[in-house]
Design a protein with these regions (language model features):
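Conserved nucleotidyltransferase catalytic core and NTase-mimicking acidic/glycine-rich helix/loop elements
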Residues: 112-234
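Short gly/ser-rich loop at a beta-strand->alpha-helix junction or flexible surface loop bordering the NTP-binding
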Residues: 24-32
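Short, surface-exposed loop and linker segments with low hydrophobicity and enrichment for Pro/Ser/Thr
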Residues: 20-21, 35-37, 149-156
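A nucleotide- and high-energy phosphate-metabolite-utilizing enzyme signature
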Residues: 1-9, 16-19, 23, 99-103, ...
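Metal-dependent nucleotidyltransferase catalytic core
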Residues: 1-18, 32-39, 43-89
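Conserved NTP/Mg2+-binding pocket subregion across the NTase superfamily
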Residues: 3, 61-148
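Short, mixed-charge, low-aromatic patches
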Residues: 13-22, 48-55, 80-87, 114-119, ...
Length: 234
């Protein structure tokens, strides 16, 4: 048994105590199950219904979960989940790409995300990220440490952008690093830039002296992703 499954089983026990027969499915997803042992374990739980008393019960366990390196689970009513696939295509698409069933049925069986919903969400996410980088750079006043912090803290979001562009273009496979690199290739982003950002995604530290070197290429990479989405035709 994979080590993270023990923590997932404990979470299922906690949720079963709270929701009893209303608990329908639990899946694990995210960096931890893809090999990043330093990341907290993230899970999605689907239930028949969720009320204030359920939230109170979960809140009592928040500290316990944190101590055991469990992220607060994403808990949704099953029908709410089905109706929100078009509203959160990127978030659900990332779970769909790589997840493992822990309890109940796999909620992603026979689920598909419309490409146009994905394209629209990609455009919003990429252009918002581009504005964030430009504004952040101006706010830094050109100070290397501030630029380094901007690059490091935004690295996970950049990795997500690359994976979403790969998915938009039919990128198969569940391997996180391979899909991320595929997104970079589609946008013509140099492998070295993608490698640097992948490193930061897992270990958000960067020598201050490297910030000025990396930021211009990073900004150009996000601009390239925006062009890919603008010209996408399915």
């Amino acid at each position: 048994m994979k080590p993270w499954r023990h923590a997932a089983a404990a979470l299922v026990a906690d949720l079963t105590h709270i929701f009893a027969g209303r608990l329908r499915s639990v899946v694990a997803y995210g960096p931890h199950i893809e090999g990043d042992d330093e990341a907290s374990l993230t899970c999605l739980a689907l239930v028949d219904s969720i009320g204030m008393s359920d939230l109170d019960a979960c809140a009592q366990l928040a500290g316990h979960w944190e101590r055991h390196r469990l992220a607060i689970p994403l808990i949704l009513a099953e029908q709410e989940f089905r109706r929100s696939l078009d509203a959160f295509p990127l978030e659900y698409g990332e779970i769909l790409r790589a997840h493992e069933r822990v309890f109940g049925d796999d909620p992603f069986d026979q689920v598909s995300i419309r490409q146009e919903d994905l394209r629209r969400a990609c455009e919003t996410q990429i252009k918002s990220h581009l504005l964030h980088l430009r504004e952040g750079y101006i706010e830094s006043g050109g100070r290397p440490q501030a630029i380094a912090d901007l690059v490091a803290t935004s690295a996970p979001a950049f990795g997500s952008l690359l994976r979403n562009v790969a998915r938009l273009n039919g990128g198969p496979g569940a391997n996180r690093i391979e899909v991320t690199r595929q997104g970079g290739h589609l946008a013509g982003i140099p492998d070295a830039v993608v490698s640097d950002m992948l490193t930061l995604e897992r270990k958000p530290t960067i020598p201050t002296t490297d910030a000025a070197r990396l930021f211009p290429q990073y900004l150009a990479a996000v601009e390239a992703l925006a062009r890919v989405v603008d010209t996408w035709r399915g």
